[in-house]
Structure formats: C-alpha cells, structure tokens
C-alpha cells in the first residue's frame, strides 16, 4: 500500500513539473487575411496548424481550444 502511495506522489510531481515547464512558452493565435483565427479540429499536435504557423514565420504550433496556436509568434506577425 505504501509503495502505491509513493508511486502516486511521484507521478503527480512529474505531471506538475511538466505542466509548469510548458506553461511559460510565449505565443499567439495567428489570424487569416480576414482577421479570423484559424480553426482546427484535432487538439494537440496538428500538421495543419504547424503549416499555418510556418506561413506566419514560426516553426511550431498546435491546436488549442479548437484554434491554431503558434509558439513564439510575435504580435507583429499575427496577421498575414
């Protein structure tokens, strides 16, 4: 029983460390030529969002809240 509790605590700590590490990555939602955010349907890693982000000048993006999010996208590069 004690081993199970210890294992659970370790798993929770590693989960928290992972979420804290990823939370500090700046970015932005890119906008199309009409000023709309790009929609996406597959949350997380998403090739269409990566392609959109590359058009906006950054290397990586993903689907978050059913909209494409680009890591390190600066305000000046949000619109095409």
UniProtKB/Swiss-Prot annotation:
Cleaved signal peptide residues: 1-22
Lineage per the UniProt record: Eukaryota, Metazoa, Ecdysozoa, Arthropoda, Chelicerata
Pfam annotation, one family: Toxin_3
Known role: Probable neurotoxin that inhibits ion channels. Is toxic to mice.
UniProt keyword Isomerase, yes or no: no
GO cellular component terms attached to this protein's record: extracellular region
Main location group: secreted
Domain notes: Has the structural arrangement of an alpha-helix connected to antiparallel beta-sheets by disulfide bonds (CS-alpha/beta).
Protein name per the record: Toxin Acra I-3
Alphabetically ordered keywords of this record: Disulfide bond, Ion channel impairing toxin, Neurotoxin, Secreted, Signal, Toxin
InterPro entries named among the record's database cross-references: LCN-type_CS_alpha_beta_dom, Scorpion_toxin-like_sf, Scorpion_toxinL/defensin
Family recorded in the similarity comment: Belongs to the long (3 C-C) scorpion toxin superfamily. Sodium/Potassium channel inhibitor family.
Ranges where the LCN-type CS-alpha/beta domain occurs: 25-80
Native source organism of the sequence: Androctonus crassicauda
Subcellular location: Secreted
GO molecular function, one term: sodium channel inhibitor activity
Tissue specificity: Expressed by the venom gland.
Disulphide connectivity of cysteines: 40-63, 49-68, 53-70
């Amino acid at each position: 029983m004690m081993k199970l509790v210890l294992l659970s605590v370790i798993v929770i700590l590693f989960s928290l460390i992972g979420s804290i590490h990823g939370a500090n990555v700046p970015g932005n939602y890119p906008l199309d030529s009409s000023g709309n955010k790009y929609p996406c349907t597959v949350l997380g890693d998403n090739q269409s969002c990566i392609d959109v982000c590359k058009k906006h000048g950054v290397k990586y993006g993903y689907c978050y809240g059913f909209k494409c999010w680009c890591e390190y996208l600066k305000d000046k590069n949000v619109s095409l």
